Amino acid sequence: KAAGTAMNLMFRYSFFTDLQIKLAQLVREEMLHYEQVLEFMSKRGQEWKGLSAGRYAGGLRKEIRTYEPEALIDVLVIGAFVEARSCERFYALAPLVDDELGRYYRYLLKSESRHYEDYLALALDVAKTAKLKDPEEDIQQRIELIREVEKDLILSPDKTFRFHSGVPV
């Protein structure tokens, strides 16, 4: 899903060269992770099953503003939150699984933390390129708003268990 989101952003905002470069790197890395997960699953006799989307990302996306460049900034800030939450989940799971999978989760944690930083840096770059009145303040306000929404999503009961879901019902 992360690779798909990044590719959509690349096509939609093709005029931001720095965005193109960073997102192309992210897509390659996410697709490598996808292949690695498929290999893990195959080695363990796990069958691939498509899952419906949980409410986490959709709940965050409700906060995206409807005008540009603010909509892009919001998507990037939300991307950072998704990556940060992935870090938290991989960190929590790594000591609970077998050694091989734990090592892989720690590897993913490092990658996701880099993606978190990349998304925030891109959001700030877009805000500066668009010559917003106070780019740093705009980004900070969006982080604070999305943090509150994200907190509610994580702490509230969730009927559908997913990697980024809230408290299981």
Regions found by a protein language model. Give the residues of each.
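Non-heme di-metal
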Residues: 1-169
